[in-house]
Amino acid sequence: MRRRILARIFLLDLAALAVGFVAASVYTFGTIFPWNAGFEFVRPGQSVFPLLGILVGGLALGSFVSSRSWGAGMPRPTYGRAVSNVTAMVVVVALAEFFVRDQFYYSRTYVAATAVVTFAAALLHRAIARARPWNEPVALITHEKKLVEDLQGAPHITVVDVLDPESHAPPGPLPRGTTLALDLRAVLSDPMAQYISSSNLAGYRIRPLVDVYEEHTGRLAIVHLAEGWELQTPMRATQTFQSMKRVVDVALTVLAAPLALVLGMLIWIAVRIDSRGPAIFRQARTGRGGRTFTLYKFRTMVDGADADGAQFAQVADPRLTRVGRVLRKVRMDELPQLWNVLRGDLSLVGPRPEQPSFVEQFALSIPFYEHRHLIRPGLTGWAQVNYGYADDEADTIEKLTYDLYYVKHMSPWLDINIFGRSIWTVLSGFGAQ
């Protein structure tokens, strides 16, 4: 079933490429037949089919890489995969042109138009698929009510049954294609162990409950973590990625610097006019490895708002100034933190850094809280785009489930997802704190 879904997604992407190839021909040359001779993007006597073959090869490469990042779960028509597939397609064309320049020539306008239309068509067929029911049927074998509730509220999963691990009564028949999600911490009765074994022989997929939970909720089940869990987390494998991520952080920050300086000057003036006190607010935060650093922000509260010590910010915090309320709404108060990114205190994407006093408090009361410091904190993060406000310890625990998920699964694709959703967060004001 997994292979059929992957094949269907790839074939639909191929159809999107065909639409893009022909639409680009209409846009560039005014005809729907791009294989006709005499076009500007092929030399006399040169066929257009090598270009089409290279585009298909690039799309296949992107699809293969995407399929490897899905894990063991059912593939889903995600928008992020459309980005990676089309990007791979364009990169392969560029590499082909670079290495065989004398034998291969094409119109960059034509390829760009093909990529744009292909991307739009790929997004469209994914939107149609996501609008239809495509839930994965799952039977949960666990006592954990919280995990069951979270999965019952998660999109694209149907909890067809919740089975008692210690039950001695034989469970009823399950629909074909159902996945059995097994709580590995549960003690199984002999009849239940036999049922799971026979289900496996009958062709039902048996998967750890925590894996299903992570895939469908984007969170780590803290209740299932144990000391040494990071040994199963491929942190060593991400060292290369973290080094590359640092290069990207610096490059993007330098590119954004001119615009950031202009906006920063305007915001600085507005803050100084609006209320008394410095425009830039400095505060100690805890970063990677528990190291304390100075974080910079535009001041959004009245001067001296933290005189009584660290406090959670509230949705309608009375300490906010008029300009500060607007800055928080669009998150422009965090613009000076680009300097923290250049210094290496922050990454563009990662868990948000907390004040040291909060870190000390949560490290004592929340299991595994300090594991969020395994990586650099970020300007935006997985918890920010999924949860929003955290104004007490209970909310902090919920956000930690997202932070630890990011620590475990950090990747370029997840960062792109977070960036895209952060733009929506800025535009909508959701989670601005």
List each model region and its residues:
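A hydrophobic, helix-centered structural microdomain
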Residues: 241-305, 340, 417-433
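Juxtamembrane loop-helix boundary motifs flanking transmembrane segments in multi-pass membrane proteins
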Residues: 3, 67-75, 232-243, 315, ...
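Short, glycine-rich, amphipathic interfacial segments at transmembrane boundaries or analogous
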Residues: 213-214, 220-221, 226, 280-322, ...
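Membrane-cytosol interface motif
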Residues: 82-86, 136-153, 278-301
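Signature of alpha-helical transmembrane segments in polytopic membrane proteins
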Residues: 1-131, 433
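C-terminal terminal-structure detector
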Residues: 368-433
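N-terminal hydrophobic signal-anchor/signal peptide
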Residues: 1-16, 20, 124-261
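A short, structured surface patch at a secondary-structure boundary
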Residues: 314-376, 418-422, 426
